[in-house]
Amino acid sequence: MAKPTVFIPVFPGTNCEYDSAKAFERAGADTIVKVFKNLTAEDIRDSVDEFVKAIDKSQIIMFPGGFSAGDEPEGSAKFFATAFRNAKMTEAVEKLINERDGLALGICNGFQALIKLGLVPYGEIRQQDAQSPTLTYNTINRHISKMVYTKVVSNKSPWLAQAKLGQTYCNPASHGEGRFVAPKEWLF
């Protein structure tokens, strides 16, 4: 059986990338972990080229958590989104998803990046508008850290293929921007 390759991009302020790489490796995958260097314009250009090469070799892209660029300016995952809106990186990600049937996964800040990029829910990188689904500040206007219960209502995702329908899982949740906001037609 072929081993999938997982690309894990590292940005200033992200974390869990090495723990995630170890988890994928324990599950039988190969991993590529690359740091996005942004000290000079040349570093940025080189990083874009390195990321494109890594995406081209991968079947999965996994966006790690943390606080990319300190979640500034004005909210989380903007550094991720800006970098991946580069034309070369956008093209590489879209080929991964559309031509090679690749997968994307985001944890914490990485999930926020998937939403800000449009990969969730549209399946493509696109600009956000006023009607785009997003994650925003919690209604209590502060960080929340607690255990939450999540019920599996569909296992059509490869990430949930082994989950039992109807099963409830207790998971830790910790976030300052965890409130999902979308037009009514997106909500069920």
Over which residues does each language-model region extend?
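N-terminal beta1-alpha1 cap of cysteine-dependent amidohydrolase-like domains
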Residues: 1-107, 111-122, 134-144, 151, ...
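Pocket-forming structural segment of enzyme catalytic cores
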Residues: 119-188
